[in-house]
Amino acid sequence: MNSENLIRRYVITGSRRLSNYWWASVVFLGAIGFLFTGLSSYFGQNLLPFLQVQNITFFPQGLVMSFYGILGLLLSIYLWLTIIWNVGGGFNEFNKKAGAIRIFRWGFPGKTRCIDISYSLKEVEAIKVDFKQGVNPQRTLYLRVKGKREIPLSQIGQPLTVEEVEKQAAELAKFLQVSVEGL
């Protein structure tokens, strides 16, 4: 067996997805629009050339629009920071050479910024597949470890098809030489 077949690494995207960039940008632009409209009504001048604020009084419309603009900016800053920090991003590494499994994720800054979990391959009991149907279907792969809880391996985002989840579970179970549960 060559070294390529001894190590498998699955990259987890985290918050650096196209949809997060899209929503952070849309919220930012909308918030700027609301804030400039509110400030324009306060000063009585058009701060942006395409705004006509003569019919908007500062109290209550301009004040409320300024408030919404500030809240939108705060939400936009939060979204951009999660993208910059890559919250939820990381990898799952299965290393037969070292006999170890390593699950790594980035979190928010602080004491638990890096979540780095390691287990021995001998501790793995099974790969579990969980299907939840409904309005928001979830298809998740779990690593079941002896005496411990189930550790999610799937990334959050667009749900995979049932076939893709089954294929991933079968490949990983074959590589780790354990059984698949939940199919």
Swiss-Prot record:
Official protein name in the record: Photosystem I assembly protein Ycf4
InterPro entries in the record: PSI_Ycf4_assembly
Subcellular location field: Plastid, Chloroplast thylakoid membrane
Keywords (A to Z) from UniProt: Chloroplast, Membrane, Photosynthesis, Plastid, Thylakoid, Transmembrane, Transmembrane helix
Pfam families: Ycf4
GO terms (BP aspect): photosynthesis
Position of the signal peptide: none
Topology in the lipid bilayer: Multi-pass membrane protein
Superkingdom field: Eukaryota
Residues spanning the membrane: 23-43, 64-84
GO cellular component: chloroplast thylakoid membrane; photosystem I
Function noted in UniProt: Seems to be required for the assembly of the photosystem I complex.
Family stated for the protein in its record: Belongs to the Ycf4 family.
Main location: plastid
